[in-house]
Amino acid sequence: MTTESAPVLVVGATGLQGGATARALLTSGVAVRALVRDPATDRAKAVEALGAELVTGDLDDRDSLTRAAQGARAVFSVQMPDLNGRGFDGEVDQAVNLIEAARAAGVPQFVHTSVSGAGQHADRVAGEWSWMEPYYAAKAGIQDRVRAAGFTHWTLIKPGFFMENLRPSVEIVFPRGVEGGLVTLLKPTTRLSLVAVDDIGTVAAAAVAEPERFHGVELELASDHLTMTEIAKVLSHSLGVELTAPDMTQEEATAAGMPDMGFGQAQLNEYPQPARPEFARALGIPLTSLEEWAHAHLRSTA
């Protein structure tokens, strides 16, 4: 099997980032081997229907990962905090398992997705934001391991705030539904580094297509960079509901139904994410504006 015909092992292919990467690779003619825990699930079957090969494995089982990575030209890596007790330590453990498995299998390229600002976060976790230090430390620690692992080629993708979090079905910003308006601790003038998840897949596919050009690239990825007032205007147009950018206290947001996971938003008022669209454009990456994303994904919900 030549390198060009070898598959890319995609972690999280049934999720947002891995799914976007699997679709982008398949569209470009690259074979995809999707790591799944249960190939019988509807989500796994949907990935298979796109043309991906399913391989059973678990990020907590290094041997299963080594088997899954055999013969792969690259690995796309994504992990989330372990919600079953290990928290951010579990996220790091899973990343280490995947990195070590890929090295043991002789995979030459590793593309990992992290988060904007990881590794540049010392100021972000000072004072009232110290509770976020474990989150950023885990992301930065995984990045360090990727750099030091010895892959022939590696790339770090560091995306900003997902546009997908602006869907009406997501309680982070619409806990009361569209009619209840936006609920956020972000100030109207705060600019968000927004990312369309499909653009993460576009970057990953570009890195696989040109591993030497993307070797060592640490891309602070944003598809758009808008204030909350501008975001509200775009959403209003697509949803057909007049929305404004609120200026809420934490107490007001809590009373409006914002879940606890939304509290970290306020950090971005003081420490914006460094991701910017011009970084991806400099690499020739086509991007999706919020207006384009909203037109494609929100109009049917209006």
Predicted regions: what is each one?
Residues 2-46, 60-63, 67-92, 100-110, ...:
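Oxidoreductase cofactor-interface core, primarily capturing Rossmann-like NAD(P)-dependent enzymes
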Residues 24, 214-215, 239, 250-302:
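A hydrophobic C-terminal alpha-helical subdomain
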Residues 47-49, 182, 261-266:
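Generic hydrophobic, helix-prone segments enriched in Leu/Val/Ile
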Residues 51-52, 154:
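Short, conserved active-site loop motifs that form the nucleotide-linked donor/cofactor pocket
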Residues 57:
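Cofactor-binding loops of NAD(P)H-dependent oxidoreductases
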Residues 244-247:
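Short beta-strand-to-loop elements that line the ligand-binding cleft
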